[in-house]
Amino acid sequence: MTQAQRTKIERLSCEKDGITINWRDCTVSHFHFIWLRHQCECAQCGSSLNGVRGLRLDLIPESPKPHKYSFDSDSLHLIWDGDGHASTYEARWLRDHCYSAEERALRKHQPVLWDKQIETDPPTFIFSEVENSSSRRLEMLQAVCDYGFCKVEGAPGLAQEADRLVELVGTKRITHYGDFELSNKKMSDTSDDIATLTEKDSINNVGDIRQALQPHCDETYRMSTIGITIFQVFEPSTEGGHSTLVDGFEAARRFHTEFPDDFEELVRTPLTGQRFDPKHAEGELPRWYRCTLPMIRVDEDQEVCGIRVNERQIAPIDLPYDQVVPTYRALQKFLKIVYDPSLMISFPLTKGDSLIFNNQRVLHGRTAFKLEDPGRQVLTNSVDLEDLYSNLRILRRRLKPEEPLQTYSQGMVT
């Protein structure tokens, strides 16, 4: 069945509470009158796409009805009782917005879950191809959406050019760390402003240590946490420092299968992540962030849509007395799954390599590495999740106009 046939109206009937459409592909859709009246996008009513609407929902009759209707294979036309307002709906638009359970399920993006087996063939792209080809850029963004991560090879090797990759994903997010963060180092005196790793008297950022880091999500202490993280390697470690990744959605799936009651415990129990950050330079102020959310978030279909795992940032648990032990029990079981080697992939990142991942799905870490000169240089930038989705929608509509609009996981958004 072609897309053209899928969006052609074969038959239509006006029922008591709405319109029933029989499509050429034998699918049936039903649209309530109140929904149709509210979704009119004529010049007078306006569109939700730009937020310029003359239509007020509170002024629509509670049970609006048309006194006249007509249709052809490509459109539906209604004249409404009362004010005689005329509404026209394109068949393609109606099919793309059909809210039957079957159509909503078809539009909902389904992530591709993975474990250690993906290590031999992770989704990988070449920077020059992605930068110069909209179709390759779409494939890269789709891979991040599907798998939660991808590698990019041959990316710019200087911090001043790092935005070339970042902007292919979305608008760079600025936090209290500044325009970008060079992890594992102090700023050097070099002209390109790239930092190198040096021994420090005290550690305020876990990225400054050389020991192995267990898989985790970043910044669980923020109410609006990082969506997409982008690592760009300027100087790799020659010994150790391999990146590690875990699919948090697959870990949650196993957790739910093996321990359903404990899974529900972490879905409903709010845990506080916190971070105290002393001032880094003269004139800066210290900061103390705290955010309280569940570790696992599910959507309206009870499917996992967001993960927020960083045991190092869990503040002293503040729950009713009888919830403390069950919560710890659930945490221990979940973290054992998260840290299971059968879920973890590990690979080196060489100079010019980049790693893009969904911080609200994929946990990241690294193996220990040796202190060297020149030191390990890895640039960290981030992009909001909705920016990646925005670019994905625009590219899909331009390059694959026949495909219906997809709905994407909203991560940890409450």
What annotation goes with each model-predicted range?
Residues M1-S133, R137, L141:
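Motif-centric detector for short Cys/His coordination patterns
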Residues C98, H109-F149, G154-A155, A159-T171, ...:
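Active-site environment of non-heme Fe oxygenases that use a 2-His-1-carboxylate facial triad
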